[in-house]
Amino acid sequence: MGAKIKIGINGFGRIGRLVARVALKRDDVELVAVNDPFITTDYMTYMFKYDSVHGQWKNDELTVKDSNTLLFGQKPVTVFAHRNPEEIPWASTGADIIVESTGVFTDKDKAAAHLKGGAKKVIISAPSKDAPMFVVGVNENEYKPEFDIISNASCTTNCLAPLAKVINDRFGIVEGLMTTVHSITATQKTVDGPSSKDWRGGRAASFNIIPSSTGAAKAVGKVLPALNGKLTGMSFRVPTVDVSVVDLTVRLEKAATYDEIKAAIKEESEGKLKGILGYTEDDVVSTDFIGDTRSSIFDAKAGIALNDKFVKLVSWYDNELGYSTRVVDLIVHIAKQL
């Protein structure tokens, strides 16, 4: 194969560290640099090695060479600690594509600061109000080389969009509502605390079911224009640490039995969407999907039809690792046009 794609990561939080794990296990990408102003290299090593959800890193031994370098086995990764993205000298490390995973620089102008340091492309690991959004398996072929800043959308959009695409392509969606029952994330509080923009979101994450807003369903209309204005949704944050589940309730254009819908999803999961969309008829629960790298795993036993035009569909996702794997897939896709 050709030269590896050299990548950098800005923000070594949940997604940043998991993107690093995914990248380090692949032979088509090479992690060359990480920037995080809030953690030292020795603490970075600890946080990467030990993970409460995904377990201990058992691949290459991770050591600190010095305050600016980590060693994964013998492979050096440069570490920066700049608060301002335009100050990060990505070019000095050869990093071509940057994963912007701080959660702070999510619009085009802010993310474009990475280009000043020599990056060629930036992938935002969050929804963006103005950067083009891509969901692998759904619309990544709409990517054009002139797009320097793009978004990998959200974990929930990555779960919902492949499922919605199959249903809309086969049966047509008149309209629909989505609910995601979503694991807690780093923005939530361990005990009741201040959250002026979202009062409910400030309540203790570990023993509440917390209704919340999500733009994930509306964002499907951005990656699948045929569904624009046809879907919206909301979220319940629940006290699990990883894996979430989408409940998509839709009105169909074409009448279909639940068995026909299951067959269509199974066929796509074994065809064009293999590795992205999964299918199971097992009696699964959420922890069964920790570590699953697929974007969306349809639970055939959990869904239900009211009639042949009104149906509830259920699909699981590891909102951390599945999403992080798609970030790397998107890197590989856009690198073909560098």
Curated annotation (Swiss-Prot):
Coiled-coil intervals: none
What InterPro entries does the annotation carry?
Answer: GlycerAld/Erythrose_P_DH, GlycerAld_3-P_DH_AS, GlycerAld_3-P_DH_cat, GlycerAld_3-P_DH_NAD(P)-bd, Glyceraldehyde-3-P_DH_1, NAD(P)-bd_dom_sf
Task: Detail which positions bind D-glyceraldehyde 3-phosphate.
Answer: 154-156, 185, 214-215, 237
Q: Name one GO biological process term.
A: glycolytic process
Please name one Pfam family that this protein belongs to: Gp_dh_C
EC number, as in UniProt: 1.2.1.12
A GO term from the CC aspect: cytosol
The molecular function terms of the Gene Ontology recorded here are: glyceraldehyde-3-phosphate dehydrogenase (NAD+) (phosphorylating) activity; NAD binding; NADP binding
* Site features described as Activates thiol group during catalysis, chain residue numbers: 182
| CDD domains documented for this protein | GAPDH_I_C (cd18126), GAPDH_I_N (cd05214)
Instruction: Spell out the catalytic residues.
Output: 155
Q: Which UniProt keywords apply?
A: Cytoplasm, Glycolysis, NAD, Oxidoreductase
What this protein catalyses is: D-glyceraldehyde 3-phosphate + phosphate + NAD(+) = (2R)-3-phospho-glyceroyl phosphate + NADH + H(+)
Specify which residues bind NAD(+) according to the UniProt entry for this protein. 14-15, 36, 83, 319
Localization in the cell? Cytoplasm
Q: Which PROSITE patterns match?
A: GAPDH (PS00071)
**Known pathway:** Carbohydrate degradation; glycolysis; pyruvate from D-glyceraldehyde 3-phosphate: step 1/5
Reproduce the miscellaneous comment text. Plants contain two types of GAPDH: cytosolic forms which participate in glycolysis and chloroplast forms which participate in photosynthesis. All the forms are encoded by distinct genes.
Provide the family line: Belongs to the glyceraldehyde-3-phosphate dehydrogenase family.
Please describe the quaternary structure of this protein: Homotetramer.
Q: Briefly, what is this protein's role?
A: Key enzyme in glycolysis that catalyzes the first step of the pathway by converting D-glyceraldehyde 3-phosphate (G3P) into 3-phospho-D-glyceroyl phosphate. Essential for the maintenance of cellular ATP levels and carbohydrate metabolism.
- NCBIfam families with a match to the protein in the record: GAPDH-I
Listed name of the protein: Glyceraldehyde-3-phosphate dehydrogenase, cytosolic
> Which organism is this protein's natural source?
Pisum sativum
